[in-house]
A protein has these predicted regions:
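Alpha-helix capping/helix-boundary segments
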Residues: 43, 138-139, 185-187
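Membrane-proximal helix-turn-helix segments that form the acceptor-binding/catalytic region
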Residues: 117-128, 160-182, 186
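Short His-centered aromatic/hydrophobic patch
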Residues: 92-97, 113, 133-139
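Conserved donor-binding/catalytic core segment of Leloir-type glycosyltransferases
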Residues: 6, 225-242
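Donor nucleotide-sugar binding/catalytic pocket of nucleotide-sugar-dependent glycosyltransferases
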Residues: 152-156, 160, 175-193, 197-218
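N-terminal strand-loop element at the rim of the active site
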Residues: 10-14, 33-105
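Active-site proximal beta-strand in glycosyltransferases
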Residues: 131-159
Length: 242
């Protein structure tokens, strides 16, 4: 039997992590692995680029509400998730005030997952996956809501640009079997934030993959030939407009 992999992702709006995920999916061999993709919300321009052989799991109501406006949660009756998110915002703000940092406060995402994940149902609970991948922070959901033999958490973040509550977040990273970093620089800043993980052999570097198939599909979405001809063939050069 082929290894069975689950990949957990928020949604597929246009973004760096989303593009990296599509690249990874296109690089995987459907003859060698089976992949289930769980998206918290089935939205985003990148949805159309999911390879046909990937099994996209159906949405689950609680997950689709995780990043919707609080007012929308209240209107739809998701009071517990709304309350958990408000509490997360309060705790995150309290922790941020104590740190005396001038960096943007990114700890709110960790705390939101910390308090909302216990309220969510399991993802495809009848299946125990050979590998579960949490492709974007926060990583509590893949840790707590997926049955898997091994787990990998992905890092896309330059930790010199944000503030996180490293002490509170460390236990989540520590419970993963592996941590995939997209570059040596990302690894460096991550280990500066979580130095105790340096000697654990958890970190593997997996560079983002830009699939030629994906590039061709994006190029075919919209025909801009008319616009190029309108401006004299679309010739460009450095420091000169079309």
């Amino acid at each position: 039997m082929k290894p069975h992999i689950l990949i957990n992702m928020h949604y597929l709006e246009i973004g760096g992590a989303e593009t990296a995920l599509i690249g990874l999916l296109n690089a995987l061999d459907s003859k060698r692995v089976d992949v289930d993709l769980f998206l918290h919300d089935h939205r985003g321009e990148m949805m159309q680029f999911i390879p046909e052989w990937v099994n996209v799991l159906p949405p689950i109501a609680g997950y689709t509400m995780l990043e919707r406006p609080i007012k929308e949660l209240a209107k739809r009756g998701h009071w517990l998730i709304a309350a958990a998110r408000l509490w997360a915002k309060y705790i995150s703000g309290k922790a941020y005030k104590k740190c005396n940092s001038n960096l943007p406060n990114a700890s709110v995402f960790h705390y939101m997952a910390k308090y909302t994940t216990p309220l969510l149902p399991k993802i495809n609970p009848a299946v125990t996956y050979d590998l579960a991948i949490s492709f974007l922070t926060p990583h509590q959901i893949t840790l707590q809501k997926v049955n898997a033999r091994k787990r990998i958490a992905w890092i896309h973040t330059d930790y010199t640009k944000i503030w996180v509550d490293a002490k509170d977040e460390l236990p989540v990273w520590s419970k993963y079997d592996y941590i995939a970093s997209i570059s040596p620089d990302v690894t460096k800043t991550f280990l500066q934030t979580f130095p105790s993980l340096a000697n654990t052999n958890k970190i593997v570097e997996i560079e983002n993959i830009l699939s030629p198939t994906f590039v061709r599909k994006r190029a075919d979405i919209e025909n801009v030939e008319e616009e190029l001809n309108k401006f004299g063939g679309g010739k460009t050069s450095i420091n000169r407009k079309i």
